Amino acid sequence: MIFKIRWIRHFLFFFTISVVFAKEKGHSFDLKKLDLAFEQNEKKLSHSITGNPRSLRAWSKRGDMRLFLGKFEDAKSDYEKMIQLDPALEVSHWRLGIAYFYLEDYDKAAHQFQIYHNFDAVDRENGIWRFMSQFKSKGLKTAREGLLKYEKDDRPPYPLLYEMFAGRLKPEDVFLRIEQANYSESFKERVLFHGCLYVGIYLELVDNKKIMAENLLKKAFENKYGQSTGTYMWQVARLHYFQLMRENKTSSMGKDSSGK
């Protein structure tokens, strides 16, 4: 009976995803060209920093370029330099928290997202990253007990996503609710980017469904809104997707070599 229920849930999840993304087609993207642009910008910003080592903008932008290149340690150093130059920036520096997360310094990441809550008590995306950090360092129970509290509304689909991370909404229901909202096509594409990114991460972390997670993160990476805007979080989605894809491939190769 338990197996049957799980099978039905998996069927419903894949059915929901197929309905929501029925019109979506694959998108090609020149990653080498993207990395080259980041490398060139990194060099220009390094030159700017040499000429003006107190330029917060240059440290900030170079930190971004380095993070987008997957140079998390270097990005962290640049972001921390900003705070050294202007300590008032610490409370609002969520990007530093993301660098800490990918460096697996989860306690520092959780702290950074915690203090950001004092700066912006509406942004549930920040609360999700704190959950992710606490999940990595202390497990699901502590992560859920430590979920930040929000009273004001937030942009879609973050209220839905936050309910999912709290354990009060199933991943498949996030996409059902998005489909039922009757957003315009362009706005729906934007909402789906965020939905795919964080439902994917939820499946990876909480449900340990790494292949399903990879499929959703691929959709976040290929999302038309994400690719056309190239936002900071699309860059994070891109990095996370390829990181998980490599991990899944390594895991699969390990199973093949063991004969299991």
Regions found by a protein language model. Give the residues of each.
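Residue-level recognition of tetratricopeptide repeat
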Residues: D64, I98, M132-Q134, I201-Y202
